[in-house]
Amino acid sequence: MPKVGMQPIRRQQLIDATLAAVNEVGMHDATIAQIARRAGVSNGIISHYFKDKNGLLEATMRYLISHLGEAVKLRLQALSDHSPASRLQAIVAGNFDDSQINSAAMKTWLAFWASSLHQPQLNRLQQVNGRRLYSNLCAEFSRVLPQAEARLAAKGLAALIDGLWLRSALRGAAFNQAQAIALTTDYITFQLRGHTPP
């Protein structure tokens, strides 16, 4: 019989162990046994909580996505200026939060994206995450741009966020937050030029 209250602790241990294993050997080579050993639990615990490796990857991605949402939320709440430009910059900064650009997170995101092409449950999670980003960006651009322009600007900014992140991840280099913020700020400024919020 499992100890009462241990489930959240065990789940977090396994998520942390998954991030570490993916960072070291990649998702493909990270075995259930390696992850369990890193977490200091038996293989059966992974099956108990997550069913299989895909379930563990899904839980790990939900964890990263939760941190992403929290990073964006905190930046939006901290704003004193609620202009579309400031809110867009806060959304961008949340996407480039340390929780999303450390080596383990970046490698896990890459593994997730690759797996989501073949796993329907992971694909649904990716679609929800992608739509959320697009919707948030579109809502801010729509405050000052006509709907069609706002949609296009949101698609462009989402592509820029993902592209900057992906290029850094594939290079294996440390993510240059300052450069990414500067490039996305230039894009936002260009898209909003000549427009003021009502």
UniProtKB/Swiss-Prot annotation:
Protein's UniProt name: HTH-type transcriptional regulator BetI
PANTHER family xrefs: HTH-TYPE TRANSCRIPTIONAL REGULATOR BETI, HTH-TYPE TRANSCRIPTIONAL REGULATOR RUTR
Domain (HTH tetR-type): residue spans on this chain: 8-68
Pathway: Amine and polyamine biosynthesis; betaine biosynthesis via choline pathway [regulation]
UniProt cross-references to SUPFAM superfamilies, sorted A to Z: Homeodomain-like, Tetracyclin repressor-like, C-terminal domain
UniProt DNA-binding region: 31-50
Lineage: Bacteria, Pseudomonadati, Pseudomonadota, Gammaproteobacteria, Enterobacterales
GO biological process: glycine betaine biosynthetic process from choline; negative regulation of DNA-templated transcription
Keyword annotations from UniProtKB, A to Z: DNA-binding, Repressor, Transcription, Transcription regulation
Listed HAMAP family: HTH_type_BetI
Record organism: Serratia proteamaculans (strain 568)
One GO MF term attached to the UniProt entry: DNA-binding transcription factor activity
Function: Repressor involved in the biosynthesis of the osmoprotectant glycine betaine. It represses transcription of the choline transporter BetT and the genes of BetAB involved in the synthesis of glycine betaine.
